[in-house]
């Protein structure tokens, strides 16, 4: 009897520890409130999937992880604002012991069987003159390419070094790609960092 009680106590303590270790948690559901199972969620270091109740939890190191985000399943929309994908990530607050973040996904009206991936390598604009060229030369060229794939979903991605150490050029860049009519993702490059920041965490 004593062994059974001890085993139960250890199991209870372990369950409590696991719950406390989950520094980031939340739910993923659709716009009708239906829980979504099997959605991949990550903090950039750890990965998990939602359970049958749409719940996820991550034991995140908040000194390293700045965001929690998910991989949007193919039968749900990629939400965007003026061409910049959003709503698939949320910022973490390292001052809180527990971060709770819920996600809501919009089901597609029609299923798709594929998409076109448009990659742009290193725009690396260093001043307003180069940004003007990006806007007046690169953007029209991209629009022509996109028009060739009418009827298909097109997703763009800038593969880092969007500017050349010029943080003030990100806003003109976002304005430029907003006219493409497609979700435009961006990857950070070594020239997309604010090196004057004393904290490595705040350089991105």
Regions found by a protein language model. Give the residues of each.
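Bacterial N-terminal signal peptides that target proteins for export
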Residues: 1-6
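Bacterial N-terminal signal peptides
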Residues: 8-16
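Short, ordered, surface-exposed loop/turn motifs in non-cytosolic proteins
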Residues: 22-24, 30-45
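A short, amphipathic beta-strand motif
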Residues: 24-30, 54, 103, 196
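A short, solvent-exposed loop/turn motif at the edges and junctions
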Residues: 43, 63-91
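Short, acidic Ser/Thr/Gly-rich low-complexity loop/linker segments typical of extracellular
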Residues: 45-59
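N-terminal active-site segment of His-dependent metallophosphoesterases
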Residues: 79-171
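Single conserved hydrophobic/aromatic residue that forms the stacking wall/gate
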Residues: 195-204
